Amino acid sequence: MKDTADITVLGAGSYGTALAISLASNGHKTLLWGHDPEHIATLSRERCNAAFLPGISFPDCLVMEADLGKALAASRNVLVVVPSHVFGDVLRQAKSLLRADARIVWATKGLEPETGRLLQDVARDALGDAFPLAVLSGPTFAKELAAGLPTAISVAGTDAGFTADLVELLHSPKRLRVYANDDFIGLQLGGAVKNVIAIGAGMSDGIGFGANARTALITRGLVELSRLGEALGAQQATFMGMAGLGDLVLTCTDNQSRNRRFGLALGKGCDVNTAQSEIGQVVEGYRNTKEVFTLAKRLGVEMPITEQIYAVLYQGKSPLDAAKELLAREKKSETAAAD
């Protein structure tokens, strides 16, 4: 089937729209699909996503499409940018509509709800093994990406040719640097765990602990990410790159991060429901915490920071008590195999 677009983006939220804008700004004809026809009609009419990215106009070669079948028929390259808790549902909905030569990449960050499985496993369950898969991950705030501010990300996949094509599609000398990576597992994991640690960093700052505590939490959070990655067969070098340290620092230190702002509200005394309402958008880290906690328990990986954040979100523990428990833990060597 002949392409009528270079790539189709599924998901018209802030990040999906930002990626679509970036792709179209490279001169690629890009189709942006969303599940709400009224929202897509508004985007098409106003030529911007005023709700999430106000003041940023769409390039001429960015086209809206409310019909999923038409969107998937337009291009073999499909970029999925939906929340992790609906990722599997969207792929199952898409399966019968995908072209035989389709190639699937996602920028969704998270794990499968309840089970803690990697999204590669969710994708294979939904689609089978016929399609090349890839993941896009790294330190990216949607507003900055959409505005064309310099950004760097990583991409990894099951097919080297697909990965190379994605680098060519996404890379822009003026706005976006894209690094190829061969660690498919590591890139998926980094995007989920950093959301959890960002909530913890926000809690710490909300309590008023300061920069020293925040930096310690980020550093030990990176240890937890590396430890979980090792158990899953990821490459440790990945966690020192864009999808590990890069994304972790970004989300833990800047208030553009919904996860960090959520943690800040909790640290200042808000309950979970109030804190989520204040954000006004999906806080991926809330679900990610349960998913990462579940995965770590299943694999027998010790992740004390994650455990305390889970206790705050799902067991009613106060952020201050969680912090006190972390500080009171038995003294250990920094370089010991388990902390």
Curated annotation (Swiss-Prot):
It is found in: Cytoplasm. PROSITE patterns: NAD_G3PDH. Keywords: Cytoplasm, Lipid biosynthesis, Lipid metabolism, NAD, NADP, Nucleotide-binding, Oxidoreductase, Phospholipid biosynthesis, Phospholipid metabolism. It comes from the Bacteria. NADPH binds at S14, Y15, H35, K109, A142, R258, V282, E284. Its EC number is 1.1.1.94. Signal peptide: none annotated. The active site is at K194. GO terms for cellular component: cytosol. One of its GO terms (biological process) is carbohydrate metabolic process. Sn-glycerol 3-phosphate binds at K109, G138, T140, K194, D247, S257, R258, N259. InterPro entries: 6-PGluconate_DH-like_C_sf (IPR008927), 6PGD_dom2 (IPR013328), G3P_DH_NAD-dep (IPR006168), G3P_DH_NAD-dep_C (IPR006109), G3P_DH_NAD-dep_N (IPR011128), NAD(P)-bd_dom_sf (IPR036291). It catalyses: sn-glycerol 3-phosphate + NAD(+) = dihydroxyacetone phosphate + NADH + H(+); sn-glycerol 3-phosphate + NADP(+) = dihydroxyacetone phosphate + NADPH + H(+). Pfam families: NAD_Gly3P_dh_C, NAD_Gly3P_dh_N. Belongs to the NAD-dependent glycerol-3-phosphate dehydrogenase family. PANTHER family: GLYCEROL-3-PHOSPHATE DEHYDROGENASE, GLYCEROL-3-PHOSPHATE DEHYDROGENASE [NAD(+)] 2, CHLOROPLASTIC. HAMAP family: NAD_Glyc3P_dehydrog. This is Glycerol-3-phosphate dehydrogenase [NAD(P)+]. It comes from Shewanella amazonensis (strain ATCC BAA-1098 / SB2B).
